[in-house]
Design a protein with these regions (language model features):
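Histidine-acidic metal/acid-base catalytic patches
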Residues: 4-16, 27-33, 49-50, 56, ...
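C-terminal segment of N-terminal export signals and the immediately downstream linker at the start
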Residues: 20-46
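Acidic (Asp/Glu)-rich catalytic clusters
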Residues: 28-29, 52-57, 74-95, 119-129, ...
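Hydrophobic faces of well-ordered beta-strands that scaffold small-molecule active sites
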Residues: 32-38, 63-65, 93-97, 133-135, ...
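Active-site beta-loop-alpha junctions enriched in small/polar residues
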Residues: 39-41, 66-70, 98-101, 138-140, ...
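Glycine-rich, proline-tolerant flexible connector loops at the mouths of alpha/beta enzymes
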Residues: 64-83, 140-144, 148
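Active-site acidic/histidine proton-transfer and metal-coordination neighborhood
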Residues: 85-92, 104-201
Length: 350
């Protein structure tokens, strides 16, 4: 890849082709970049090569390593071996990491300055042939900290500015996820514009909007111009006495309009990877009828909130989630992920 190549959403497909792996359609009616966010099956005890084998077993074209732990470390030679193994089997690889914000609760300051840590992941992405590095700011915690959300955003943007030249030299797009309650779509979109949409994009996660009292479609409408990869997740929401109960479910078993989300995602973001992510043991009570809930959400537009609440009004109360042992969790993850693959393929074929 040429020095200082800027990757935008429209050029991600070309970057994949440059790896030498065909971007032709995969199994059946799959989009050519349908695959798996490996966080879905993180408890299996697999190494990077076994994750590739899992993709081959299910005729998946793309996998995304969530972080260095999932990959098995950031040693350059290891990344080269994983790329070679994946290339031989026709599997495309994307790389991920955690926070890129030095003030976020997810950053461990004992690691030292955050910039070198980020650059190690960028280098791993380059060696893996990943055109994107999935990253994030934080979580819902950053809405409630003494430091306002806007200050966390400023710290992240400063970090990005410091790294722009080095990252673009390596030809990697920094792809910020709307993650675990940190940003609504309307908040993340202007951040991409300010950072520079020629080298910073979005990993759209369709499950995380419910953690920010947002309809997944609303988030998609805001973020579509910037999406370079995606986590396809389903959710179920229902109204409660104090607000809304929300949980992630097996894809196809939710009530938040994923058929329409998938249709719009494919239409408006044709070059983005569609990566199934399955998490089914998380529950959140969003007590939106209590005034103290709204700290950190003061600027949410009423019309957008009501689109979210309308989804909850159509839901029915669900039974409590089971408490699982470590072994049961591993089985549950694999079973639910595999069922999600079956379900999303039915939707592709519809």
């Amino acid at each position: 890849m040429n020095r200082r190549t800027f990757l935008t959403a429209s050029s991600v497909a070309a970057a994949y082709s440059a790896t030498g792996v065909s971007t032709a359609s995969g199994a059946g009616n799959d989009p050519s970049r349908f695959g798996l966010d490996l966080w879905s099956v993180r408890s299996q005890g697999w190494n990077a090569f076994q994750y590739v084998d899992h993709a081959v077993e299910h005729s998946l074209k793309v996998i995304q390593f969530a972080d260095a732990n999932t990959l098995g470390g950031l040693h350059p030679e290891h990344a080269r071996k994983v790329k070679a193994y994946a290339d031989e089997r026709g599997v495309l690889v994307e790389m991920g990491m955690g926070t890129i914000c030095p003030t976020a609760s997810g950053w461990n300051a004992s690691k030292g300055p955050i910039e070198p840590w980020i650059l190690r992941h960028v280098e791993a992405a380059r060696l893996l042939g990943s055109p994107v590095l999935r990253c994030l700011m934080g979580s819902a915690k950053e809405r409630k900290t003494e430091l306002p959300l806007e200050k966390h955003t400023e710290a992240m943007l400063k970090t990005l500015r410091n790294l722009r030249s080095q990252v673009t030299d390596m030809g990697v797009v920094m792809a910020i996820e709307n993650h675990s309650g940190d940003y609504q779509g309307r908040e993340l979109a202007p951040i991409i514009e300010e950072a520079g949409k020629d080298w910073v994009g979005v990993v759209y996660d369709s499950g995380n909007p419910i953690w920010t009292i947002e309809d997944p479609m609303v988030a998609l409408e805001h973020l579509a111009p910037y999406i370079v990869s995606s986590h396809l997740r389903d959710s179920y929401v229902w109204a409660t006495e104090e607000g809304v109960a929300a949980r992630w479910v097996v894809f196809g078993e939710g009530n938040v309009g994923m058929k329409d989300v998938l249709r719009v995602l494919l239409e408006r973001c044709p070059n983005a990877s569609i990566l199934l992510e399955t998490i089914t043991v998380r529950h959140n009570d969003l007590k939106v009828k209590r005034s103290d809930f709204w700290k950190g959400y003061e600027n949410v537009p009423a019309n957008e909130f009501m689109r979210f609440y309308a989804l909850a009004e159509k839901g029915n109360p669900q039974p409590p989630l089971p408490k699982l042992t470590k072994e049961e969790m591993a089985v549950r993850q694999l079973t639910d992920s595999n069922q999600g693959i079956v379900n999303v393929r039915k939707m592709f074929a519809a």
